[in-house]
Every structure is written in C-alpha cells, then in structure tokens.
Amino acid sequence: MTRIGTPLSPTATRVLLCGCGELGKEVVIELQRLGVEVIAVDRYANAPAMQVAHRSHVINMLDGAALRAVIEAEKPHFIVPEIEAIATATLVALEAEGFTVIPTARAAQLTMNREGIRRLAAEELDLPTSPYHFADTFEDYSKAVQDLGFPCVVKPVMSSSGKGQSLLRSADDVQKAWDYAQEGGRAGKGRVIIEGFIDFDYEITLLTVRHVGGTTFCAPVGHRQEKGDYQESWQPQAMSPVALAESERVAKAVTEALGGRGLFGVELFIKGDQVWFSEVSPRPHDTGLVTLISQDLSQFALHARAILGLPVPLIRQFGPSASAVILVEGQSTQTAFANLGAALSEPDTALRLFGKPEVNGQRRMGVALARDESIEAARAKATRASQAVVVEL
C-alpha cells in the first residue's frame, strides 16, 4: 500500500529527478500535488523543473562520481531519469545497492543509445523494424549506405531532439550526413545507426503506462517532425483497428522487456495495417505534451501515479486535441513573451511557457494546446495560438 509522508519532514517521500527540462517540470508539478518532496538535478542552473522543485543540484550528470554523491546525500526513495545523458552505469550500481530507478536502471541504460534498444527490439524480441547497420568509421558507414541504398537515414547512436539526423537521397549527401552526425552526437564523435527508409503513411507515439494494475495505453498520438524534432502533435490519430492492435502488441512487448513501472513513449511507423518499431523513451515524451489538454490524466500525472505505485483505473480522452510548439531563434537570457491575450482568445486553448533560462540558437520555449471538433481544426487552432505569441529577446 502506498504511503506518502510530509515534504521536508522525516516522513517525506523523496523523488530525485535527473534532468530538468519542460517534461520534468510537469512531472514535478504532478508529484508536488501528491505531497512528494522533489529534488531536481541537471547540468545547468534554473532549469525548468528546478523552478518548481523543493531544491536542486547542478552537476555533470555523465560524471558517475558526482551523480552518486548527490544520490547518497539525498537518499531518495525513487530516482527518475528525465533525459538520456546520464551516467547509467552508476544507476545500475545504485539499483543493485537498493535504490529504486524508474522504470529500471537497465531501461535507462538500454535507451541511452539507439543501439541497445534497437538490438533488443529487433534481435531479442523479433519486432518489426527498418533494416539497419551500425558503423564507427566513415568506411563502414559508406558500406552500410551502399548496402541499404537510397533513401536512407543516419543518426548518431546517442543524440536527442533530432540532433545529427539526416535523410540521404543520393551519393551527394553521404559525406555531409556523416559530418553532421559526428557534430550532433551527444557524447561527441562516434558511432552511428544507418536505417533503410520506410515509406510510412504516418508515425505515432503510443504512450504506454506500466502501473500497479497492469499496462494501459493512451489513445495514439500523431505528430509532425522537422529535422527529427517535434513541431506539432495531435490525439487521437486515426488508425485502422488492425494497426492499433499491432501497435499495442509491439508497445507492450518492448515495455515489458524493459520492465519496472512508469510511462513510456513508444514511437512507431504505420503504413496501412503494417507497424514498425522505431524508438522508445522510458519516460514522458515531448509529443505527449498534447495530453495536457486531451486527457483527464496527462502523461505526467500517469507517470507520477505509476512511480508511486498508484492505480490507473481509466484514462478519459476529451476528443480531437493538438499541440504546436513555440520555437524561439536567437540569443537571450531574458526572453519575454507578449500578445498572450490574443494567443488565448479562442475557447479550449492553453499555453505552457517553459521558463528556460536562455536561448542560444533555436530552442523550444513553450507549447500551445487546443481542442476542437476535428483534428484538423484542433491543429489549426493550436498553430494560431502558437503563432500569436510574440517573443521578445
């Protein structure tokens, strides 16, 4: 039976969040609502989730000794990774010593890079995926491209938000795609995955929650990407019953293999009734921001319940809903947002401004949310709200 104490007291139930972006911020808010004491950790100060946590620490999260020192000092009941770039070997060791990692340290380790999770899905679980090769050198990469043919996709095995990702259409793209992948990898230069291109009709995120009562699926989330980075998402994505059933089978297989409890974002390619596994995040997913307006329990509320061992008896979906990101380009440490009244002038709209302390280049700084009578209308409304926001750098 779940028992939650009083924050900042000897009975407190403590959660330590590793990574403090906008997704972590919403998770912290949901945990706070349930009376949990939250400690936020990231590599930079004043990150979004730090602004709503009880306290925070700034460390290099790829430094295992620094991560261990914070965890041993704070003694959290639950360690919750919010990003991939963490010293996962340290999480594995801490889990073996009795700490609880959400969903599991193995899940964090396998999903830290694309190779671990792709080999699990394709080679161990025999799930349908695109054809693929891994390469460490330009020579091996060139051979893989030749073998798979054009078009194909190259990505660093360790990167997020589309960084370093390219679609190769001809031999002219081979060198520049390699160079871009080497620049975009999270741990610096290195290994890449080359994938055969699937001519899919659409892609979805199937938000899958493993909780005390079993496994529950949210309605499928459709999304549009640019350069591998999410621009808008909507729910529910229309699918054939056959494709939806197969999507749930694939999502259940991969989340069961990763184990533990929590919310997972399972990315899938769909063509007609066919489904291919793409990737999985063992945590809330950026495309799932739409659930802040589309469901009675957002993906963040679901994650909080699952972490704490609370049941999810039912998820109510409110009908056609959409999200559109507020993307800011430039440089500033004091970004301001204006014209918000116009952005919120239509019924069934909402905004989330993430409170990121700086922008240097291009950065997602907020999201507009909307509901309407159809997906098309909801998408258009969310986009209008997003575009109405005036950004002052």
From Swiss-Prot:
Protein's pathway: Purine metabolism; IMP biosynthesis via de novo pathway; N(2)-formyl-N(1)-(5-phospho-D-ribosyl)glycinamide from N(1)-(5-phospho-D-ribosyl)glycinamide (formate route): step 1/1
GO biological process, one term: 'de novo' IMP biosynthetic process
Record field: catalytic activity: N(1)-(5-phospho-beta-D-ribosyl)glycinamide + formate + ATP = N(2)-formyl-N(1)-(5-phospho-beta-D-ribosyl)glycinamide + ADP + phosphate + H(+)
Chain residues that bind ATP: 114, 155, 160-165, 195-198, 203
Residues that bind N(1)-(5-phospho-beta-D-ribosyl)glycinamide: 22-23, 82, 286, 356, 363-364
Domain of life (superkingdom): Bacteria
Residue ranges constituting the ATP-grasp domain according to the UniProt record: 119-308
InterPro entries: ATP-grasp, ATP-grasp_carboxylate-amine, ATP_grasp_subdomain_1, PreATP-grasp_dom_sf, PurT, PurT/PurK_preATP-grasp, PurT_C
Positions bound to Mg(2+): 267, 279
UniProt GO MF annotations: ATP binding; magnesium ion binding; phosphoribosylglycinamide formyltransferase 2 activity; phosphoribosylglycinamide formyltransferase activity
KW ATP-binding (keyword) present: yes
GO CC annotation, single: cytosol
The protein's Enzyme Commission number: 6.3.1.21
Keywords: ATP-binding, Ligase, Magnesium, Metal-binding, Nucleotide-binding, Purine biosynthesis
Record-linked NCBIfam families: PRK09288.1, purT
UniProt xrefs under PANTHER family: FORMATE-DEPENDENT PHOSPHORIBOSYLGLYCINAMIDE FORMYLTRANSFERASE
Quaternary organization: Homodimer.
Purpose of the protein: Involved in the de novo purine biosynthesis. Catalyzes the transfer of formate to 5-phospho-ribosyl-glycinamide (GAR), producing 5-phospho-ribosyl-N-formylglycinamide (FGAR). Formate is provided by PurU via hydrolysis of 10-formyl-tetrahydrofolate.
Family to which this protein belongs: Belongs to the PurK/PurT family.
Protein name as it appears in the record: Formate-dependent phosphoribosylglycinamide formyltransferase
Gene: purT
